[in-house]
Design a protein with these regions (language model features):
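Phosphate-sensing "switch" segment of ASCE/P-loop ATPases
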Residues: 369-371, 387-480
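AAA+/SF3 P-loop NTPase mechanochemical coupling elements
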Residues: 360-377, 392
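Conserved glycine-centered beta->alpha loop in an early N-terminal alpha/beta scaffold
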Residues: 3-5, 28-251, 319-320, 324-325, ...
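DNA transaction DNA-binding modules
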Residues: 27-32, 58-77, 190-246, 337, ...
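P-loop NTPase catalytic core of nucleic-acid-dependent motor ATPases
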Residues: 214-303
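A short beta-strand-to-loop transition that corresponds to the Sensor-1 phosphate-sensing loop
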Residues: 333, 372-382, 400-402
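Conserved catalytic/switch belt of AAA+ P-loop NTPases
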Residues: 344-359
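AAA+/P-loop NTPase substrate/partner-engagement loops
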Residues: 288-341
């Protein structure tokens, strides 16, 4: 008991004196609770057993009522260095904690440390409202967390914020929910509101993130660093000067630069995603070319976050692609991919621009990430291989780097690490007008028609997008008359024959036969089949093993051979009964006459023989 507090007798507890003292402290939650405990202990010592009921009755009789609300409705947050002052209703909010008197003359404790909402974030794309919450566990400074209202206003979900060092548990979760909801309701016109976005690139209202005023990031916290890396720094003229010096050369780094600009026009002109892959030995400047592409939009420095490697999971890559959205996805060190054959599925995923549908822990489905962009990659080897599916080869422009891409790569790095982010913002400002979008669409058609007919439709499309973006960047940014031409890109486009998996599968089987011709002779051991004129008869089990070893589908390859007129098939089967060592056995009977330059036929993607 406080030494300055009078010791009341049992008789005095039947008077107003002790309760008047208590009423005087009603607006100071902590002092009120201290005095209540002292008086209650005093009552117990003198044998007075009705202190709680008497105190409750006195308070009820003497509290002032205004418009049906208790006078405590005028309480305000009283935190040291608070970012905003808010009405708290009947909550006492100070550095000692957040308390409220309950009907039993005790205290409901919402939180033992300062916490309050400071901003309302409305997502541009889906309208979801989140709150920025600030809290302080000590006097070292305020911290913040952004959470959905469905989390903050649920006594079960809010307990997840304990991982952020907010003091919340089963004990106080319900009271903390009430406190936060009361503050938002009482201060709806006081708490500032801002538009928010969870990704980079074009938004549903036609604007471009992050180049919008009063825009806040409300996405996954692990992407905040990348979001903040997209900004301008240093002098635009210095970046422009070094970049123009690269464009004066014939370096393929010019294509990497064009791809960086091209990424944001893919959605604008309604075309498909594609990949640009630089490969070759170390020391050629592949990574510097990628960093030059990064510097168009943001910070290319180590640790800035935008420039990533292949050292991650498929799910992580999917989420990253959905986050960068329309800006280029730039990945280094393809050699980190352990299973390069299965990487084709990643290529399809990146170029399709949509992630997998997944269930949510709370039921229903998670939001499926989508994106429309260009992926710029590098490594020591090409992504595609002999048995790659046509769909994968079709979507990638691969450039082998045998010679140095820069005359002085170190100088390029020094400049772009201190001067970056200006060109992308300027390019986007031009590109956001309707006139520019129409111009881009017209240029695309023009370039598409100018590219030779030897490459596939998807390869031609990707090349036309690169040429369109570079032409616009030349006009709007560089003004140097050094735009890329079709002749600059065509050498790197896959031909229709190279993309045709059936043709490559036939070539693989043909090469196998040539290198194992002795095993097709009579009485050879082992025996793989027989030969009759130009027709090579491969035993069914051997043919299927050859295809499996090369990564081809036996059935799909037989179908292609049939369509191309190279298969002698049975009456109701692609395999045919033939004599091998005097015995009838089912074989793949393939006409291996010398190739004709016009023999290959176009086959739809769905019929192509890849696994």
């Amino acid at each position: 008991m406080s030494t300055s507090l009078k010791e009341f007798t049992k008789e005095e507890f039947n008077t107003e004196a002790p309760y008047r003292l208590l009423f005087e402290k009603k607006d100071d939650g902590f002092a009120y609770l201290q005095l209540y405990n002292d008086l209650n202990a005093n009552a117990e010592r003198v044998g007075f057993k009705r202190f709680g009921a008497m105190a409750k009755a006195y308070m009820k009789q003497h509290e002032e009522h205004r418009s049906g609300l208790s006078s405590v409705v005028n309480n305000l947050t009283n935190f040291k260095d608070q970012p905003i002052e808010l009405l708290t209703g009947d909550w006492f909010a100070s550095d000692d904690g957040i308390l409220r008197r309950n009907d039993n003359q005790g205290m409901d404790v919402a939180c033992v440390h300062p916490i309050l909402p400071v901003q309302r974030l409305v997502n541009i794309d889906d309208g979801t409202v989140r709150l920025r919450i600030m809290f302080r566990r000590d006097f070292r400074g305020w911290r913040e967390v952004i959470a959905n209202k469905s989390t903050l206003f649920s006594s079960r979900e809010i307990k997840k914020l304990a991982d952020k060092d907010i003091s919340v548990s089963d004990k106080n979760a319900a009271f903390l929910v009430e406190y936060l909801q009361d503050l938002e309701d009482l201060n709806h016109n006081t708490i500032p509101e801002a538009q928010s976005v969870s990704h980079l690139g074009w938004t549903s209202n036609g604007m471009f993130s992050p180049y919008m005023e009063n825009l806040e990031f409300d996405g996954q916290e692990n992407f905040r660093k990348i979001f903040e890396s997209v900004h301008s720094c240093g002098e635009f003229e210095k970046w422009l000067e070094i970049t123009k010096s690269v464009r004066k050369t014939d370096s393929v780094a010019r294509i990497a630069l064009a791809a960086s600009f091209a990424s944001i026009i893919i959605k604008t002109i309604g075309k498909l995603n594609f990949m640009l892959h630089f490969w070759g030995g170390s020391g050629t400047g592949k990574t510097v070319a990628q960093l030059l592409a990064v510097s168009v939009w943001g910070d290319p420095n180590d640790g800035a976050g935008y420039f990533q490697t292949f050292n991650g999971t498929l799910v992580g890559l999917e989420q990253l692609a959905g986050f960068v959205n329309n800006l280029p996805l730039i990945l280094d060190e393809f050699q980190l991919v352990k299973d390069k054959k299965s990487f084709e599925q990643t290529v399809y995923m990146l170029c399709e621009g949509i992630g997998k549908t997944r269930g949510a822990k709370t039921g229903g489905l998670q939001k499926t990430p989508t994106w429309k962009n260009c992926t710029i990659t590098s490594g020591e080897s090409p992504i595609t291989h002999a048995s790659s599916g046509a769909g994968a080869i079709n979507r990638i422009i691969e450039i082998e780097c045998r010679e140095a891409l820069f005359e002085d790569a170190i100088e390029v790095l020094e400049v772009i690490r201190s001067n970056y982010g200006h060109a992308g913002k300027l390019f986007m400002a031009f590109m956001s007008t309707e006139q520019a979008k129409e111009k881009a669409a017209a240029l695309y058609k023009q370039f598409y028609r100018s590219i030779g007919a030897s490459s596939t439709e998807k390869q031609t499309m990707a090349a036309a997008i690169l040429l369109t973006a570079d032409a616009l960047a030349t006009e709007w940014i560089f003004c140097d008359g050094r735009a890329l031409t079709a002749e600059d890109i065509e050498p790197y486009l896959h031909t229709k024959e190279a993309v045709d998996v059936g043709a490559r599968g036939y070539e693989y089987v043909h090469d196998f036969y040539v290198s194992n011709a002795a095993k097709f002779e009579t009485n050879s051991d082992p025996c793989f089949g027989s030969v009759s004129g130009d027709e090579v008869r491969i035993i069914k089990s051997v043919f299927e093993r050859i295809c499996d070893d090369g990564g081809y589908s036996p059935r799909a390859l037989l179908s292609w051979l049939d369509q191309s007129g190279r298969l002698s098939k049975g009456r109701d089967n692609l395999y045919k009964s033939a004599k091998v060592n005097g015995k009838a056995v089912r074989c793949a009977c393939i006409n291996m006459a010398e190739n004709s330059p016009n023999e290959f036929v176009s086959v739809e993607d769905g019929e192509l023989p890849f696994n």
